[in-house]
A protein has these predicted regions:
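Von Willebrand factor type A / integrin I
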Residues: 1, 6-7, 260-350
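Short, charged loop segments at secondary-structure junctions
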Residues: 237-270
């Protein structure tokens, strides 16, 4: 068995290293016998597949001398994250299963699964016009976010636009030509409290929430609307998204971040209101609407903010959300648009 163990090897074949939630991937394990002596029983198992495929137990194969066996697997990615597919276990035994030996193989193979981005351009979202808040331009401050190109300095150009590093290199002044943005913005609060991950079902719903949020941010970028995301995670984040590069940064953030916030969502909202002038649009993305969140949103409405709520339509059996559907109806009655983001996702899929 020691000889058999030394002659055994495994390789991996895969379609890509980058996927999105909902993608189906093909992974093939190639088990090899590099020796000339057949190995009657080889139990091949991928550690990662064991956690991803329900009922997966590995494969028991016969490996002839100088032969290989291809073991194909299909995976449906339901959760975002970085997956390590590099660990494979090969357990060899003789014909009578008396002698056994195990060979653990590690090959560096990390697969990234990003949130799913849906095209919301053809979906009717009530209150869409409210997203487009005019940024206060009375100050006359230019927005220097998007560099379109570089050109030589012309008399009268704003010195703030001078590319000093490039100018020093060439011995003459060059300025940055900035691409204008639409002058519109939206403010999006995301409830990533740790309660979102209370069960396997909650984890899937949390994925829907993140998928919808990044899809909404992408819609804003495509329509040249600056988006400020306020994320209630353990490490609270304020992320501005107004370019494709910034959107990619948002995708990287959600690749590695799960719901782990400990501060109550309502307290998080209140602590960040100072960043948002009254009259601006605020979008709230939360799996459910409990009594506390309902009261805060009604107060925001009274303070002059324009509010939209994006929620998941499933009723949850816990005390905090016992009045969930009733709260949604109350918010609608006071003029707050409430949108079931799960229904939006399902419409896009059709």
């Amino acid at each position: 068995m020691c000889i058999a163990k030394k002659s055994l090897n495994a390789k991996l074949r895969y379609d890509s290293k980058i996927y999105n939630v909902g993608d189906i991937a093909n992974f093939t394990i190639i088990a090899e016998n590099l020796g000339i002596i057949p190995t009657p029983y080889v139990y091949v198992q991928s550690i990662m597949l064991r956690s991803l495929i329900e009922g997966y137990r590995g494969n028991l194969i016969f490996l002839g001398g100088d032969k290989c066996v291809w073991i194909k697997n299909k995976i449906l990615f339901t959760k975002r994250g970085i997956y390590d597919f590099g660990d494979i276990s090969l357990e060899a035994s003789d014909l009578f299963c008396i002698l056994k030996s195990v060979k653990n193989i590690h090959k560096e193979l990390y697969i990234k699964v990003y949130p799913k981005v849906y095209d919301l351009s053809n979906i009717s979202l009530s209150g869409r016009d409210c997203y487009e808040n005019r940024i206060n331009s009375k100050s006359g401050i230019d927005d220097f976010t998007l560099i379109k190109d570089i050109r030589k300095y012309n008399t009268g150009d704003n010195l703030k636009k001078v590319h000093w590093k490039l100018s020093a290199k060439h011995g003459e002044l060059y300025v940055k030509n900035f691409d204008s943005i639409s002058g519109k913005e939206c403010n999006l609060f995301m409830n990533m409290h740790i309660d979102n991950l209370g069960s396997d079902l909650f984890e899937i719903i949390e994925e829907d929430m993140v998928d919808f949020s990044v899809s909404l941010a992408k819609y804003m970028v495509n329509n040249r609307i600056r988006t400020k995301l306020f994320i209630n995670a353990k490490e609270q984040k304020n992320i501005e998204v107004e370019s494709k590069e910034a959107f990619l940064g948002l995708m990287e953030y959600f690749l590695k971040s799960k719901s782990d916030g400990t501060l109550e969502f309502t307290s998080f909202i209140k602590s960040n209101l100072r960043h948002i002038p009254k009259g601006n649009w605020i979008g709230i993305v939360s799996i459910a609407v409990d009594d506390s969140l309902r009261d805060v949103l009604m107060n925001l409405k009274e303070m002059g903010y324009r509010v939209n709520v994006f929620y998941h339509g499933k009723v949850f059996n816990n005390l905090k959300n016992v009045n969930f559907l009733k709260n949604v109806e109350l918010l609608k009655n006071v003029g707050i648009d409430c949108i079931n983001f799960k229904q939006v996702i399902e419409k896009v899929k059709q």
